[in-house]
């Protein structure tokens, strides 16, 4: 039985009072000798963000904007799944499932809602993120999330087929969808293709110059930037205490990723705080990282993608994989270079993203 109920976001003012008290009572590190972002989030940058979060930022603005769009909670097995379902204005509107990743949320795609009126848009909160719960076992992986999303689209919402969009962990989710349910997934739009492990582990003399450049960049990135993957994959509980108890600690962990993975100069502080507020108020900073554990230890092999695939590549994203590798591994029908934006894709560049998606669907 899958019960479904309407949902609206409503964070009580008392929770913002508590947030401001916690920020005011924060104990900051004494040592300010590390400058810049190479060592993580700088103290002065984080102080400025916390000051604005406590004394200038207005969540109710975002809350009212989001509540204009239909939201629901659906009970599927032992998971409460939150999702937006915005029916298209056209008859027989093409359904689009959009899958976000970490450390973001449904907010990755929220700016595209008014740009995609002709389509039926479905954006779930991944289990463990925002208003969606984890299963009783305490973690989930991309494969299980794909099955959950397919049931949402077909059994709950009644769609026979749909287009799937994903980035970051959402990319893995929709790729499992495409390999497991190719009769239902009409097409796949990806904003990244993950990590090309076969390039990174191949001998240098077997690689093209472009592949060798990628291997060197990927090796350096994993050494300097990839520690979070190992921590979240192995010790999510230990990390979770600080993420749950301190808004400053949570922000320090997340802001670094937003800075390093995005087109930061174009990134709005309100966009950043919208996501931080959602994480803080739902206490999902600790539960969201459980997917790394699930993916590291319980993920089954993925089949080959056979459905038509589009790539929307953003210039400030991390580790862009060489196009020839993508062509070998996906049935590529469209490759769009976005004019700006980074890893958080439609949050940073909603208009170019929406145009690429519309073009892809038109030609399916």
Predicted regions and their residues:
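Alpha/beta-hydrolase
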Residues: 2-8, 12-17, 23, 27, ...
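Short amphipathic alpha-helix adjacent to the substrate-entry channel of hydrolases
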Residues: 107-121
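C-terminal subdomain of alpha/beta-hydrolase-fold enzymes, centered on the catalytic histidine
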Residues: 232-364
């Amino acid at each position: 039985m899958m019960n479904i109920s309407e949902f609206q976001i409503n964070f009580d003012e008392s929770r913002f009072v508590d947030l401001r008290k916690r920020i005011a009572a924060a104990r900051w590190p004494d040592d300010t000798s590390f400058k810049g972002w190479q060592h993580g989030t700088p103290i002065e940058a984080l102080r400025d963000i916390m000051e604005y979060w406590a004394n200038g930022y207005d969540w109710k603005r975002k809350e009212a904007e989001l509540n204009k769009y239909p939201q629901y909670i659906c009970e599927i097995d032992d998971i409460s799944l939150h999702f937006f379902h915005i029916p298209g204005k056209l008859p027989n509107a093409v359904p689009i499932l959009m899958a976000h990743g970490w450390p973001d949320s449904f907010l990755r795609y929220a700016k595209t809602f008014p740009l995609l009126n002709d389509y039926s848009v479905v954006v779930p909160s991944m289990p463990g993120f925002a208003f969606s719960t984890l299963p009783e076992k305490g973690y989930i992986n991309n494969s299980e999330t794909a099955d959950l999303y397919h049931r949402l689209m077909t059994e709950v919402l009644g769609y026979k087929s749909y287009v799937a969009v994903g980035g970051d962990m959402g990319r893995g989710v929709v790729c499992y969808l495409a390999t497991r349910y190719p009769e239902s997934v009409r097409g796949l739009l990806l904003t990244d293709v993950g990590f090309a492990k076969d390039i990174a582990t191949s001998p240098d003399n077997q690689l093209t110059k472009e592949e060798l450049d990628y291997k060197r960049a990927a090796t350096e990135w994993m050494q300097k930037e990839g520690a979070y993957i190992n921590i979240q994959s192995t010790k999510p509980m230990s990390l979770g205490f600080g993420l749950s108890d301190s808004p400053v600690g949570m922000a320090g962990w997340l802001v670094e990723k937003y800075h390093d993975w995005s087109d930061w100069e174009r990134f709005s502080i309100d966009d950043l705080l919208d996501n931080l507020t959602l994480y803080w108020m739902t206490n999902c900073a600790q539960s969201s990282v459980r997917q790394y554990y699930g993916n590291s230890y319980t993920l089954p092999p993925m089949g080959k993608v056979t459905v038509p695939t589009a790539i929307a590549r953003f210039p400030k994203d991390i580790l862009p994989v060489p196009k020839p590798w993508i062509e070998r591994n996906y049935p590529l029908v469209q490759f769009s270079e976005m004019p700006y934006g980074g890893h958080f894709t439609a949050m940073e560049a909603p208009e170019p993203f929406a145009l690429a998606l519309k073009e892809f669907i038109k030609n399916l």
